[in-house]
């Protein structure tokens, strides 16, 4: 009986996730016929779900598109993903996986002025991963890169930019690169993190072996706590912030 209930809940969640995924595709015109999409597969729950949604959708008649995945190892950051698990996950979805390794230097500023200018490890890690992805995508003829940022990520980014940069914007659902023939899409942009967590638990998505040592050492972790407090004050805050982002056209950058 317990297994039956879990299957029912998993099916219900999948329907909800897929419905919001399809709505995001239509709302922000994320995917077109003949697209070749490279998915950034970190090994976390968000990227695993993103790949599953796209891989299943690729078998639907319209739009017809091709999906492959890429995992970038960061040699000098001590966290670990089970690459064999990612290979099996991709194989089950009939998706080709590309694995690359890169690294970056973390500076040691000697004064406060240099420290303010110093890029965070999170920024450097993300930027260097994307450089590898951009290079591979262009070399293999992909025209779109799909990243696994969900609605909570976009809302947190908006609050970070408002708090620390004095501007109200976020990571767009669709971003056309100016210096290369690539478009970044975020198909999970209308999906809540709590639904992803619940589905990942039911599906038994494997967690990373070791978490990133910088995971809690950033403004983003502070903003997450702030946002949790905001939701305690107003449980509808998510929808208010999302409406504001849409009203100001912050989710499309062409």
Name what the model sees in each region.
Residues 66, 152-232:
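Catalytic subdomain that performs nucleotidyl-dependent activation
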Residues 2-156, 164, 194-202, 252:
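ATP-dependent adenylation/nucleotidyltransferase module used to activate substrates
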Residues 74-76, 104-106, 175-178, 191, ...:
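Residue-level detector of flexible, active-site-proximal loop/helix-junction positions
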Residues 11, 15, 48, 127, ...:
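Electropositive phosphate-/nucleotide-binding environments in soluble metabolic enzymes
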Residues 218, 236-254:
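A short, charged, Gly/Pro-tolerant segment at domain boundaries
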């Amino acid at each position: 009986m317990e297994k039956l209930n879990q299957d029912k809940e998993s099916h219900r969640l999948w329907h909800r996730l897929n419905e919001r995924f399809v709505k995001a595709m239509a709302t922000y015109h994320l995917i077109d016929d003949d697209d070749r999409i490279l998915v950034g597969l970190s090994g976390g729950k968000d990227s695993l779900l993103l790949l599953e949604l796209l891989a299943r959708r690729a078998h639907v008649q319209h739009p017809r598109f091709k999906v492959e995945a890429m995992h970038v190892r960061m040699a000098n950051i001590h966290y670990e993903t089970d690459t064999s698990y990612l290979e099996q996950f991709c194989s089950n979805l009939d998706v080709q996986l590309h694995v690359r390794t890169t690294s970056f230097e973390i500076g040691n500023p000697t004064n406060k002025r240099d420290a303010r200018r110093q890029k965070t490890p999170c920024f450097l890690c993300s930027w260097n991963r994307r450089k590898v992805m951009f290079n591979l995508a262009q070399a293999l003829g992909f025209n779109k890169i799909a990243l696994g940022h969900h609605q909570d990520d976009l809302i947190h980014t908006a609050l970070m930019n408002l708090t620390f940069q004095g501007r109200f914007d976020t990571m767009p659902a669709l971003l056309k690169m100016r210096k290369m023939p690539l478009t970044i899409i975020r198909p999970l942009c209308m999906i809540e993190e709590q639904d992803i967590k619940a589905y990942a638990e039911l599906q038994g998505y494997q967690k990373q072996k070791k978490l990133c040592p910088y995971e809690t050492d950033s403004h983003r972790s502070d903003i997450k706590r702030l946002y949790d407090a905001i939701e305690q004050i107003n449980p509808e805050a998510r929808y208010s912030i999302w409406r504001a982002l849409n009203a100001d056209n912050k989710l499309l950058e062409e």
